[in-house]
Amino acid sequence: MALILGIDPGSRRTGYGVVDVVGNRSRAVAFGTITTSHKEIPPRLGEIFAGIDQVVKEYGPAEVSIEKVFMARNADSALKLGQARGAAIAAVMQACVPVFEYSARQVKQAVVGKGGAEKNQVGEMVKYLLKLDQRPQEDAADALAIALCHAHMRLSLARMAGATSVRRGRVR
């Protein structure tokens, strides 16, 4: 059993998703969105830090995966996204949990099978793969997809490295 926390950073809404992974099986443990309430960026960053810190303390993930910053058309938006991402990573690193980064294209490829997939396709696949009753809110679905991407990469890397216990449902 390994808990993986996926984070979809955003300056207004940061999605999180905790996935329990045993071998090639995954199940959603918790997911949601940290919605910031302030107009100014410094208090929003504090809310993101506190929210992710609370999730890390509550679930104790073994590993964390987070989406890489993409180059936005608007430099100010990219800067705010980078700051939100930094606040989330700082909260995780405070607990000494390893962080892995994936591009949006890598996440879509791992979950949907094509890197150019639409948001609704990602949400539907997350619902299907984790056997959820309904599609999660967009930011939470993205966070769960990021966690699933890491679970797939982790399993693939273990197989390539010749991990012996992958065959028994555990990666060691």
Swiss-Prot record:
Where on the tree of life does the source sit, at the highest rank? Bacteria
Residues bound to Mg(2+) 2 are 67
What residues form the catalytic site here?
Answer: 8, 67, 139
Name the Pfam families on file: RuvC (PF02075)
Main location (coarse class): cytoplasm
Write down the chemical reaction(s) this protein catalyses.
Endonucleolytic cleavage at a junction such as a reciprocal single-stranded crossover between two homologous DNA duplexes (Holliday junction)
For this entry, list what GO says about its biological process: DNA recombination; DNA repair
- List the subcellular locations: Cytoplasm
List of residues binding Mg(2+) 1:
8, 139
Which cofactor does the UniProt annotation name? Answer: Mg(2+)
Q: Name one GO cellular component term.
A: Holliday junction resolvase complex
How does the cofactor bind to this protein, according to its record? Binds 2 Mg(2+) ion per subunit.
Q: Which InterPro entries match?
A: RNaseH-like_sf, RNaseH_sf, X-over_junc_endoDNase_Mg_BS, X-over_junc_endoDNase_RuvC
Keyword terms: Cytoplasm, DNA damage, DNA recombination, DNA repair, DNA-binding, Endonuclease, Hydrolase, Magnesium, Metal-binding, Nuclease
NCBIfam families for the chain: ruvC (TIGR00228)
Q: Which family does it belong to?
A: Belongs to the RuvC family.
Assembly and partners are described as:
Homodimer which binds Holliday junction (HJ) DNA. The HJ becomes 2-fold symmetrical on binding to RuvC with unstacked arms; it has a different conformation from HJ DNA in complex with RuvA. In the full resolvosome a probable DNA-RuvA(4)-RuvB(12)-RuvC(2) complex forms which resolves the HJ.
**Described function:** The RuvA-RuvB-RuvC complex processes Holliday junction (HJ) DNA during genetic recombination and DNA repair. Endonuclease that resolves HJ intermediates. Cleaves cruciform DNA by making single-stranded nicks across the HJ at symmetrical positions within the homologous arms, yielding a 5'-phosphate and a 3'-hydroxyl group; requires a central core of homology in the junction. The consensus cleavage sequence is 5'-(A/T)TT(C/G)-3'. Cleavage occurs on the 3'-side of the TT dinucleotide at the point of strand exchange.
The cross-references to PANTHER family, in alphabetical order and at most eight, read: CROSSOVER JUNCTION ENDODEOXYRIBONUCLEASE RUVC (PTHR30194:SF3)
- The name of this protein is Crossover junction endodeoxyribonuclease RuvC
